[in-house]
A protein has these predicted regions:
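Cys-nucleophile CN-hydrolase/nitrilase-fold catalytic domain and related Cys-dependent amidase chemistry
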Residues: 18-109, 178-193, 197
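Active-site catalytic loop in hydrolytic enzyme cores
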Residues: 94-171, 175, 180-193, 269
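Hydrophobic residues at beta-strand termini and immediately following loops
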Residues: 8, 116, 140, 243, ...
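Short polar catalytic/cofactor-binding loops
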Residues: 9-15
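Extreme N-terminal starter segment of soluble prokaryotic enzymes
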Residues: 1-7
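C-terminal beta-strand edge segments of enzyme domains
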Residues: 208-295
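CN hydrolase (nitrilase-like) catalytic-core segments centered on the catalytic cysteine
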Residues: 68, 72-86, 156-248
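Short beta-strand scaffold segments in enzyme catalytic cores
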Residues: 89-91, 103-106, 138-139, 204, ...
Length: 295
């Protein structure tokens, strides 16, 4: 079974209206649809571009972003339906019970919307934007495999990816937003490590461009990539495809899930199967116990 995925290196720049944001998003989605992609991944914090709309800084506070939630939902839902694709609309800041959450959204062709809040929050998100960490990990079972969405900093924590794999995820989508080479490579190297540890695919992308009037979004350093385990059937460096750093573009690749399953059973190394669960937690067993308690 194969999945075709596209990842958008989203160009942030000052805009004057939500319509401009809509036009830019639509351009990327329709471009990916021309490649007949099953999934389209946008980066973290793409809706911070909406904070640049008003020259008088009416929208410059992160607290104003939730007011765009309905428009954001309508836009991505309509595009998912129109193109019959699953769209991970990057992340958008929403408000629940007076708290702000940085939430990744999965837009289904049938109109459903899945949500995965960011679970690990960076110091800047806490200190400058008062973002609250989400609670709970979920995976998204689909007709073509099971996926999870772990945002940027989340991918730097091996345990949460172990949990996602134990819950059945074969593909981890990682929308990110980093402002320099240090941050970018932390995320990128973590993505590679997670593919090796769990024998999964990771699809990642980041923001490029700049928002000169939006604090903490003035600099962006991003690159999309489709990352594989390091074994004989895959590319030697574990990179199926990657974009040009800091360019406005889309990358597209096919993920062969059958090949992934084969490597887990008969690969040069079988890292998932060879875990020493007598020495450290067995996440498959923990997930099973959790499901029994819930059920």
């Amino acid at each position: 079974m194969k999945l075709r995925v596209s990842a958008v290196q989203y160009h942030l720049h000052t805009i004057n209206s939500f319509k401009e944001f809509e036009n830019q998003v639509t351009h990327y989605v329709k471009t990916a649809a021309e490649f007949k992609s099953d999934f389209i991944l946008f980066p973290e914090f793409i809706t911070t571009q909406l904070m640049s709309i008003d020259s008088d800084n009416i929208f410059s506070s992160i607290n104003q972003l939730p007011q765009f939630t309905e428009q954001y939902y309508n836009l991505f839902s309509s595009l998912a339906k129109e193109t019959n694709t699953h769209i991970i609309g990057g992340t958008h800041v929403i408000e629940e019970n007076g708290k702000l959450y940085n939430v990744a959204h999965m837009f289904y062709p049938d109109g459903r919307i899945g949500k995965q809040p960011k679970l690990h929050i960076t110091p800047t998100e806490v200190d400058e934007w008062n973002i609250t960490p989400g609670e709970g990990l979920q995976v998204f079972p689909l007709s073509k495999g099971t996926v999870a969405v772990l945002t940027c900093y989340d991918i730097e924590f091996p345990e949460i990816v172990r949990m996602a794999k134990a819950m059945g995820a074969d593909v981890i989508f990682c929308p990110s937003c980093t402002d320099d080479s240090h941050g970018f490579h932390r995320v990128r190297y973590s993505c590679h490590a997670r593919t090796i540890e769990n024998q999964v695919y990771v699809v990642t992308t980041g923001t490029v461009g700049a928002l000169p009037t939006v604090d903490f979004m003035r600099a962006n350093y991003g690159q999309a990539a489709v990352i594989t385990p390091n074994d004989v059937p895959f590319p030697q460096r574990g990179i199926m495809i990657e974009g040009d750093i800091n360019n406005d573009m889309i990358v597209t690749a096919d993920l062969d899930l059958d090949l992934l399953y084969e490597v887990r059973e008969k690969g040069s190394v079988t890292t998932w199967r060879d875990r020493r669960v007598d020495l450290y937690p067995d996440f498959e067993e923990l997930v099973k116990i959790k499901n029994e308690l819930i059920g």
